[in-house]
Amino acid sequence: MDHRTSIAQAMVDRISKQMDGSQPDEYFNNLYGNVSRQTYKFEEIREFPYVAVHIGTETGQYLPSGQQWMFLELPILVYDKEKTDIQEQLEKLVADIKTVIDTGGNLEYTVSKPNGSTFPCEATDMIITSVSTDEGLLAPYGLAEINVTVRYQPPRRSLRR
């Protein structure tokens, strides 16, 4: 996998691992492994809550001496269905995912080379850039979007001039 795909998968793995019900003093919700990179329509989701991590826009900052920073947007969609107060439930899910992002440290991931070998990498920074919900428009369903910017530095490549 390349950097973009590997970072998104590492985020899926982190959310799934942290919100597995083993830390009831840290998280309101247990996702029961309902986290992936796949998006579904509400009717296609069999178990709620469900979290989907997407690969968004990537921008780069090129610096002297061949250094560069890459900034990858990861839109995280949170789906839920609640019989009582869907907005309150969505806010708890958003709070849990924000906790995962804010307290998890650097995001470690593995990148594959064309020859099949792999090498470990690390995203150095994650920033939550926006959070929005449907504000009850989809009741009894609920949808929230959390946009996260992940900053990483790809391996330095020699300059050919």
From Swiss-Prot:
Keyword entries, A-Z: Late protein, Viral genome ejection through host cell envelope, Viral long flexible tail ejection system, Viral penetration into host cytoplasm, Viral release from host cell, Viral tail assembly, Viral tail protein, Virion, Virus entry into host cell
Self-association state and partner proteins as the record states: Homohexamer.
Highest rank taxon of the organism: Viruses
Pfam families hit by this protein: Phage_tail_terminator_7 (PF23818)
Biological-process GO terms, alphabetical: symbiont genome ejection through host cell envelope, long flexible tail mechanism; viral tail assembly
Residues passing through the membrane, by range: none
InterPro entries (UniProt xref): Phage_tail_terminator_p142 (IPR056418)
Subcellular localization, as worded in the UniProt entry: Virion
Protein name (record): Tail tube terminator protein p142
Keyword field contains Transit peptide: no
Keyword Magnesium carried by entry: no
GO cellular component terms, A-Z: virus tail
Function according to Swiss-Prot or TrEMBL: Plays an essential role in tail assembly by capping the rapidly polymerizing tail once it has reached its requisite length.
